[in-house]
Amino acid sequence: MLEIRYADEVLRTLRRLNKRNLIRHKIEELAADPKSLRSNVTRLQGRPESRLRVQDWRVIYRIEGNILWIDNILPRGSAYEVN
């Protein structure tokens, strides 16, 4: 199982969301077995991160060693804009 670490901004966003329990559950599933949610996971082109689809939300994450870094949680439309 991977250790989950959230960016500070992600924690603030997560507290405001109605679907926070569902999103946290999916993140925990991903940490337990990164291959279990394969159909909802896609590697982002030209970036080191991947995305996890949770209904209309996108969880942007990366795995470094034994750590699952949650970099951002965004609504579907703005998840793929280049920063």
Regions found by a protein language model. Give the residues of each.
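A short, surface-exposed loop/turn module that caps and links secondary-structure elements
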Residues: 28-53, 80
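Enriched for short, Lys/Arg-rich terminal
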Residues: 1-4, 9-17, 22-24, 31, ...
